[in-house]
């Protein structure tokens, strides 16, 4: 692809994403399906703006690479070791059982047994990009089903190499003996990468961070991700696996959050490009000429994988409320099928339109997943949002809540318990189905669903409620919910949780003045108690705490328009001197005017 063509393709990709994704979100079908439909529209079987799909698809796999790096950052080695049973137990069982069943079904058609084996293995794989994206959207990351789903995906990445090595053996074109020297060199290179990454990455990033230039840190992060991907590709291994390992090696470093911040924008754009490329690869000609075969194949593929995954989840002990989420999110074919089937085609394992039919089946199965998860959500909503059992005593008897609490994690539970203890009518919205199931057993009126959906807020009583308390884990969800409430329910008093000063600034800019930084108040209280243990009178310690709170809030408001670090540092030093002067005056005025408090608890 020439430079001008590449630039034109980039413009078309951006235009397709900007046009299709907001429309898809408005229609309620999700961003992923919007990307896929945009790809169909601009691809060779749509308007025909782009024809070189294979090259773009290979480039767009970098989105999966960046995503796996961020996933690795969230998993330290000890956590990965804890997942070994689910990775090599459930993951291996899923691949083997699904591949065997699907290969058997393919053999019932015109597929030779060799082609059926390759087809079964390829179809058994799930889409890492699709599944992880949907897991994040559904809040499954920290749930049992989400952890198990990630384990299955990780094993599938590990299974890439033996699957590719199996193709020439099935085609009868493998050498009579393996090149053990070549294999040994690859193993040594891989071990060298692990050792080098373990002992060199942190010192290198410490040196780069010392320069104080943010752009260089971002460049170094990109170099690490792309370099590890290229290195693994040269070894014939999965690029995504390489970047995942690099992320795990840095998971316990002090640069973890900065690395994630530097990578996140690239990950989002490239993941969108990947889904658009998958949509472009859909061969509508084959779909038209073999419509019945393709439809049956997609239904059978999704059904077989759901059956296998559901049974494995049940055997593994996953809660019944989470099994369908786990099975549904992994029910599609994956991007690895494109690589495996292309390799098999080069070895002449497929005949006629067999490869095209399999690829169309994989692509359409990926398009069914967002819709399938919508159905799962509706089923879960009916299952867990219905009326309480007769022996349960609901906290709220009125259908018109005074307060809606969004998120019922540790932060939200404290707020909810306080409100309910004071007989306030509240409704709680939570998208972690395991938390919903558990809390409802204890009598809490908790409902399953994504609170960023206007219809759900309306059905939860937002039009009649007086206030909404937002305690989402993700700052992006908080800001999106603030915008929705201000637009559709302007009468609501918005109270929000801020994870830190950055989120506090964003809330203030959005006009939200009632917020709480999750560690600020508890840290202030512990600081007050520390002052008392050091000999300060409890009343003075309380006043010192109040002065600090007021000054910190004032400084927070003053720094909203200031983005330069040097300005913030200068203002912080000035505020510290001001606080010291206030405390000195307080001490002089109140040294002999204590209120006689013995303690303040």
Swiss-Prot record:
Membrane topology: Multi-pass membrane protein
Subcellular location: Cell inner membrane
Residue span, RCK N-terminal domain: 400-519
Primary location class: membrane
A GO molecular function held by the record: glutathione-regulated potassium exporter activity
Keyword presence, Calcium: no
Stretches that traverse the bilayer: 4-24, 29-49, 55-75, 87-107, 115-135, 152-172, 177-197, 207-227, 230-250, 268-288, 291-311, 324-344, 356-376
Alphabetized HAMAP family for the sequence: K_H_efflux_KefB
Superkingdom per UniProt: Bacteria
Record-linked InterPro entries: Cation/H_exchanger_TM, K/H_exchanger, K_H_efflux_KefB, Na+/solute_symporter_sf, NAD(P)-bd_dom_sf, RCK_N
PANTHER family: K(+) EFFLUX ANTIPORTER 3, CHLOROPLASTIC
The protein's name in its UniProt record: Glutathione-regulated potassium-efflux system protein KefB
A Gene Ontology term for the protein's cellular component: plasma membrane
Keywords, ordered alphabetically: Antiport, Cell inner membrane, Cell membrane, Ion transport, Membrane, Potassium, Potassium transport, Transmembrane, Transmembrane helix, Transport
GO biological processes: proton transmembrane transport
Protein role: Pore-forming subunit of a potassium efflux system that confers protection against electrophiles. Catalyzes K(+)/H(+) antiport.
Gene: kefB
Subunit annotation: Interacts with the regulatory subunit KefG.
Similarity annotation: Belongs to the monovalent cation:proton antiporter 2 (CPA2) transporter (TC 2.A.37) family. KefB subfamily.
């Amino acid at each position: 692809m020439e430079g001008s063509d590449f630039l034109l393709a980039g413009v078309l990709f951006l235009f397709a994403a900007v046009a299709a994704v907001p429309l898809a979100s408005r229609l309620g079908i999700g961003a992923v399906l919007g990307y896929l439909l945009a790809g169909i529209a601009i691809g060779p079987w749509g308007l025909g703006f782009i024809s070189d799909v294979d090259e773009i698809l290979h480039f767009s796999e970098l989105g999966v690479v960046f995503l796996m790096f961020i996933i690795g950052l969230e998993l330290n080695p000890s956590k990965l070791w804890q997942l070994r049973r689910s990775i090599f137990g459930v993951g291996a069982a899923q691949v083997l059982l699904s591949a065997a069943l699907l290969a058997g079904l393919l053999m019932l058609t015109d597929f030779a047994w060799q082609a059926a084996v390759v087809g079964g293995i390829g179809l058994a794989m799930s889409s890492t990009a699709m599944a992880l994206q949907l897991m994040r959207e559904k809040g499954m990351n920290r749930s049992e089903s989400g952890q198990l789903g990630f384990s299955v995906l990780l094993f599938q990445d590990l299974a890439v190499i033996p699957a590719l090595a199996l193709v020439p053996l099935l085609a009868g074109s493998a050498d009579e003996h393996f090149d053990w020297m070549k294999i040994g060199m690859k193993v040594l290179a891989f071990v060298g990468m692990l050792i080098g990454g373990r002992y060199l990455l942190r010192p290198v990033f410490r040196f780069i961070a010392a320069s104080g230039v943010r752009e260089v840190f971002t460049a170094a992060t990109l170099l690490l991700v792309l370099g590890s991907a290229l290195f693994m590709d040269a070894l014939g291994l999965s690029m995504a696996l390489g970047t995942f390992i690099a992320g795990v090696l840095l998971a316990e470093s002090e640069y973890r959050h900065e690395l994630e911040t530097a990578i996140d924008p690239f990950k989002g754009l490239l993941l969108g490009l990947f889904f658009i490329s998958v949509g472009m690869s859909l061969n509508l000609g084959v779909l038209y000429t073999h419509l019945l075969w393709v439809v049956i194949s997609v239904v059978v593929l999704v059904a077989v994988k759901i059956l296998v995954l559901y049974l494995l989840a049940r055997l593994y002990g996953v809660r019944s409320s989470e099994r369908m989420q786990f099975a549904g999110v992994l029910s599609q074919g994956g991007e690895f099928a494109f690589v495996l089937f292309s390799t098999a085609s080069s070895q002449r394992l497929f005949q006629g339109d067999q490869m095209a039919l399999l690829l169309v089946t994989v692509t359409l199965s990926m398009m069914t997943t967002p819709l399938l998860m919508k159905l799962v959500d509706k089923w879960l909503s009916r299952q867990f949002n219905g009326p309480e059992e007769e022996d349960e005593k609901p906290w709220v008897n009125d259908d018109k809540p005074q307060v809606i609490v969004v998120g019922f994690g540790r932060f939200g539970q404290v707020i909810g318990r306080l409100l309910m203890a004071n007989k306030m009518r509240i409704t709680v919205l939570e998208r972690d189905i395991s938390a919903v199931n558990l809390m409802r057993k204890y009598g809490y009126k908790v409902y399953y669903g994504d609170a960023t959906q206007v219809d759900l807020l309306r059905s939860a009583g937002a039009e009649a409620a007086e206030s909404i308390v937002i305690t989402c884990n993700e700052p992006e969800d908080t800001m999106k919910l603030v915008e929705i409430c201000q637009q559709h329910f302007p009468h609501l008093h918005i109270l929000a949780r801020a994870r830190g000063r950055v989120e506090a600034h964003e809330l203030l800019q959005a006009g939200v003045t009632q917020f709480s930084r999750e560690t600020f108040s508890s840290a202030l209280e512990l600081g007050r108690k520390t002052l008392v243990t050091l000999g300060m009178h409890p009343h003075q310690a309380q006043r010192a705490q109040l002065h600090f709170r007021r000054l910190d809030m004032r400084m927070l408001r003053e720094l909203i328009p200031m983005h330069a670090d040097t300005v913030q540092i200068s203002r912080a030093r000035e505020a510290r001197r001001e606080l010291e002067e206030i405390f000195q005056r307080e001490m002089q005025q109140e040294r002999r005017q204590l209120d006689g408090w013995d303690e303040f608890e």
